[in-house]
Amino acid sequence: MLEVIHTGLNIGSKTLLHDISFIIKPGEMVAICGPNGAGKSSLIRLLCGELKPSSGEVRWEGKSLAEWNLLQLARQRALMQQHAEVGFAYTALEIILLGRHPHHLGANRPQDYQIAMAAMQEVGAVHLAEQIYSTLSGGEQARVQMARVLAQIWESSQGARLLLLDEPTAALDPLQQHRMLTIARKWADKGDVAVVAIVHDLNLAAQYADRIALLRDGRLQAIDRVESIMTPAMVEACFDLPCVLLNHPDGGTPMIAARRHPSSSMIAT
């Protein structure tokens, strides 16, 4: 279980996150949404332990992240970053094998290659295995990075696992966006994996997440079931976007559509 307890983050004199609290259980997928500059990426960096909170704490499986052995934590928690720069001519397979490093203390083992290939199969990227990562398109790189983090937490024997995704759909076309979130949903449905994903598209978030967390100006505006978050009042309060509520014709998921004629105040901002 992931617990965020009255957590704040200051960088220098600037406060990026204010008194944030929530709990996410394995088997659940939570989407973090909010306008640009809301603090979404800062929050996910706190959740993975890359940043240390200025106040409060983040706990995984009942223990503060600061108390975890880093190697053991890396076997249970993986972060797919929004931008992953690679300075060497690694193949896609070699990038994915990086996710296996916490599981061995030397050369890759046969099972590491098997898991890496299974992860590539999971994201539909087997054909990219021997291609140089830097020559791939943004969308292909995103799929390789997804395979890397899946390979990192592949084994259920490690106990509960945490999958953190920082804008996993950012570089993808619509089909690949849905494929990526379908994979995230599948892993949450395993029952022992908690998934947290930053998603800019509220309608995408509503289709795949159990709950949506709305973040604005570093403050948690709300975290609730999709039906409670996807209301015109809630969305306008977070995004300053006048909108109407629709229901998806396939399944009835609540969807948001911006009003066709924005106000002059919207244009000005």
Curated annotation (Swiss-Prot):
The UniProt entry, under Gene3D superfamilies, shows:
P-loop containing nucleotide triphosphate hydrolases (3.40.50.300)
| UniProt family annotation | Belongs to the ABC transporter superfamily. Heme (hemin) importer (TC 3.A.1.14.5) family.
Report the subcellular localization.
Cell inner membrane
Q: Which residues bind ATP?
A: G34, P35, N36, G37, A38, G39, K40, S41
Family matches, as InterPro entries: AAA+_ATPase, ABC_transporter-like_ATP-bd, ABC_transporter-like_CS, P-loop_NTPase
- What keyword terms does UniProt attach to this protein? ATP-binding, Cell inner membrane, Cell membrane, Membrane, Nucleotide-binding, Translocase, Transport
Q: Spell out the protein name for this chain.
A: Hemin import ATP-binding protein HmuV
Identify the main location: membrane
Q: What region holds the ABC transporter domain?
A: 2-242
Q: Where is the signal peptide?
A: none
Q: What species is this protein from? A: Methylobacillus flagellatus (strain ATCC 51484 / DSM 6875 / VKM B-1610 / KT)
Q: What's its membrane topology?
A: Peripheral membrane protein
Annotated GO molecular function terms are:
ATP binding; ATP hydrolysis activity
Its Enzyme Commission number(s) read 7.6.2.-
| Primary role | Part of the ABC transporter complex HmuTUV involved in hemin import. Responsible for energy coupling to the transport system.
Q: What quaternary structure, including any partners, is listed in this protein's UniProt entry?
A: The complex is composed of two ATP-binding proteins (HmuV), two transmembrane proteins (HmuU) and a solute-binding protein (HmuT).
> Transmembrane stretches, by residue range?
none
**What intrachain disulfides are recorded?**
none
